[in-house]
Amino acid sequence: MPINKSEKPESCDNVKVVVRCRPLNEREKSMCYRQAVSVDEMRGTITVHKTDSSNEPPKTFTFDTVFGPESKQLDVYNLTARPIIDSVLEGYNGTIFAYGQTGTGKTFTMEGVRAVPGLRGVIPNSFAHIFGHIAKAEGDTRFLVRVSYLEIYNEEVRDLLGKDQTQRLEVKERPDVGVYIKDLSAYVVNNADDMDRIMTLGHKNRSVGATNMNEHSSRSHAIFTITIECSEKGVDGNMHVRMGKLHLVDLAGSERQAKTGATGQRLKEATKINLSLSTLGNVISALVDGKSTHVPYRNSKLTRLLQDSLGGNSKTMMCANIGPADYNYDETISTLRYANRAKNIKNKARINEDPKDALLRQFQKEIEELKKKLEEGEEVSGSDISGSEEDDEEGELGEDGEKKKKRRDQAGKKKVSPDKMVEMQAKIDEERKALETKLDMEEEERNKARAELERREKDLLKAQQEHQSLLEKLSALEKKVIVGGVDLLAKAEEQEKLLEESNMELEERRRRAEQLRKELEEKEQERLDIEEKYTSLQEEAQGKTKKLKKVWTMLMAAKSEMADLQQEHQREIEGLLENIRQLSRELRLQMLIIDNFIPQDYQEMIENYVHWNEDIGEWQLKCVAYTGNNMRKQTPVPDKKERDPFEVDLSHVYLAYTEESLRQSLMKLERPRTSKGKARPKMGRRKRSAKPETVIDSLLQ
C-alpha cells in the first residue's frame, strides 16, 4: 500500500518465535514413552534430553517465550497474539502461524475448543478482541471488517467459503496489492458471532484425515484472513482510512511415513505437505543467511502466500509446537532448530494508510450520495408536475433547435421531496374527482385528461418506489459499516472480560518473574566472585578442574550438535530423494502413456506450443481456443433429394457368397412397372423365372 514514508517510517522487527510443548497423550502413556523435554518458562528455555544415551549432554534452546504442558489457552493468546492484533487494529499487517510435527497441537493452539471459553484458541479469541476494541472506539470512528478462509490442499488453493470447494484458484500478484487470490470470496461481518459462524462453515469443508499419530490430522494448510478498515478524523479535519490484514495460519504437520503409516491418498497428501514445509524451511534459511541472493518464495503456494509475512510488510509471530515423548526426539530437535533460525528473520512493517481500493471509503461515499438524494428528492421529469406545458414547444426547430431541446431536458428535471409527493397525490385525487363531475365534457377530452392523470400517477408511484429503494440500500450499507462505541460484544463480552483479567494476571506474573530473574543473576554473580577468590593452591586446582569440566562438557555438546546436524541433513536428503523417486515414478508412468497414445510428430508439436503458467502451476497450450474440437470443420448436411451424378448404385451387388446376401440381391431385381393411367401392353408372356430359393440353392451347389 502506498504511504508517505516521511510521515510513517517503517518499523524493523524480528519474527517473534514462541514454543509450546503439549503433555503426553494417552497413547504415549500406554506405550510407556518417557518425557524428553523440560520447559523453563522463567528463563524462556527448552531443554531436550536423549534418554537412550546418558553420555550425550542435553540440548538447550532459548526463545522469546516458552509454554509448558500446563499452559493455558488465555495465557498463550495474551502473551503472543494480543500484541500482533493490536498492531493490526493500528493498520499494520499481521501473521500468526503454528508450525511443527503432526500431532503436536497446532490446531488446538490456533482453534481450540470453541464451545468452552477457557479452551478457545488464538483465532476465536481474536474475534472477541477485535470487536471489543471496536466497541470501545470513539463515536466518529467507522470500521469495516471482512473475512476469508482458504486451504492449500495438494498444492491447490481452494476457497473454503465458496460454493465449489474443489475449484482451484489462481495466485496473482500486483505491484500495488502484492500477492492475492483471484476470485476468493470475502464476507462482511458485524460481530464476533458472525465470524464464528463463518469459521465453523469453513472448518467443515477442510480436508481432515486419520493417521497412526493423529485421528484428526489436518491434510491441508489453512489460512483465515481478517481485513479491518478503519476511518477516523485526523488533526486536519479530514477522514483518514487505514487498513490492516491479519493472517491466521494453521499449517499441516510434517510427517514420516514409517510413523504415520500413511498409504494411498494419505501418502500423496503427506508428500505434498512435506514438500511445502521443506520449501518453507528453505525460505527461512535463505532469509537468515546474508549471502543468499534468491529467496525461493515461488517454489510453493504456501511460501508464496506468506511472502509478506516472512521478510516483508508484516508483524509475524510463529508458534512452534513440539511433543514431549522421547520417540519424537529427532522431530522435536528439527522443529526447534527451524524455530531458532526463524528468530533472525527481519520484517519491515508499515501502516497501510489510504489504500486505493479501501472498501470502507467506497461505502461511505455511497451512503453520503444516497442521503443527499433522499434530502433533495428524486429526479423526475418536469412534465410530471407542470402537465403538458412543453407540448406547445415540441417541434420548435431552428438554428439553435438542439440547444433549446437540451435546455428543456435540463429544466424538465426537478427535485421532488416526500412532502411534495403527498401534495401531488392530493392534487391528482382532486383532478380525478373534478373529471368525474364534468359530465358535459366531450368524450375525447375526458379520455385525454384521464390518460394524463394515469400517467402522472404512474410517475408518482415510480418516484415513491425509488425513494423506498434508496432507503433500503442506505440501510443495508449502514449495517455493513460498524460505528465505534456501539456495544457489539453480546456473547463475546464474557470472553473479552476473561482475556482482560488474564492479561492483568500475566502482567503481574511477568513483573514478579523479572524480579526473580534479576535476583537469580545477582546470586550467580556472587557465587562466581566467591569461586574466584582462592585461599590455597589446592582450591585453585579444584576451581580450574571444575572450569575444565565445564569446557569439556561444552565441547562434547558442540560435537553432539554437529553429529545431530549431520544426521538431520542426511534425513532431509533421504526425504528429498524419496520424493524425487516418487515423482520419477509418476513421470515414467506419464511418459509411458504419452509414448503409447500420442505419435512422435504430435508430441513435438505439443511441446512447441505449451508454456508453464506460474500462477496456477500447470502447463497450458498456446491458442487453445483455436485447436481441437473448438475449430472442428462444420460439414454441410447433404440434401437427400439431390443425387450425386457420380454415385454408383451398389444396392444389388452382394459382397459375399452367403445365402442371405444372394436372397437380398435376387429379391431386389424386380420388373419395371408402368406409370399410372397407362395399360400394360399385351404381349406374349415370358416364362416365369424360378423362385429365388431355388436359384440360391442351385448357385450354392
Curated annotation (Swiss-Prot):
Q: Does the keyword Zinc apply?
A: no
Q: Where is this region: Interaction with DCTN1?
A: 365-701
Q: Spell out the Acidic residues composition-biased ranges.
A: 376-399
> What are the UniProt keywords, alphabetically?
ATP-binding, Cell projection, Cilium, Cilium biogenesis/degradation, Coiled coil, Cytoplasm, Cytoskeleton, Microtubule, Motor protein, Nucleotide-binding, Phosphoprotein
Specify whether ATP-binding is a keyword of the entry.
Answer: yes
According to the UniProt entry, which residue ranges have a biased composition of type Basic and acidic residues? 409-423
Q: A single GO CC term, please?
A: cytosol
PROSITE patterns, per the entry:
KINESIN_MOTOR_1 (PS00411), KINESIN_MOTOR_2 (PS50067)
List of residues binding ATP: 100-107
Tissues expressing the protein: Expressed almost exclusively in adult brain tissue (mainly in the cerebellar granular layer) within a single type of neuronal cell.
List, as start-end ranges, the regions of compositional bias called Basic residues: 674-689
Gene3D superfamilies noted in UniProt: Kinesin motor domain
Q: Which residues carry this modification: Phosphoserine?
A: 689
Q: What is its main location?
A: cytoplasm
Q: Name one GO biological process term.
A: keratinocyte proliferation
Q: Fetch the SUPFAM superfamilies from UniProt.
A: P-loop containing nucleoside triphosphate hydrolases (SSF52540)
Q: Which residues form a coiled coil?
A: 355-592
Domain Kinesin motor residue range list: 14-345
Q: Where does the record place the region Globular? A: 599-701
What is its subcellular localisation? Cytoplasm, Cytoskeleton; Cell projection, Cilium; Cytoplasm, Cytoskeleton, Microtubule organizing center, Centrosome, Centriole
Q: Which PANTHER family match?
A: CHROMOSOME-ASSOCIATED KINESIN KIF4A-RELATED, KINESIN-LIKE PROTEIN
Q: What does this protein do?
A: Microtubule-based anterograde translocator for membranous organelles. Plus end-directed microtubule sliding activity in vitro. Plays a role in primary cilia formation. Plays a role in centriole cohesion and subdistal appendage organization and function. Regulates the formation of the subdistal appendage via recruitment of DCTN1 to the centriole. Also required for ciliary basal feet formation and microtubule anchoring to mother centriole.
Oligomeric state and interaction partners are given as: Heterodimer of KIF3A and KIF3B. Interacts with CIMAP3. Interacts with CLN3. Interacts with DCTN1. Interacts with FLCN. Interacts with AP3B1.
What family does this chain come from, according to its entry? Belongs to the TRAFAC class myosin-kinesin ATPase superfamily. Kinesin family. Kinesin II subfamily.
Q: What is this protein called?
A: Kinesin-like protein KIF3A
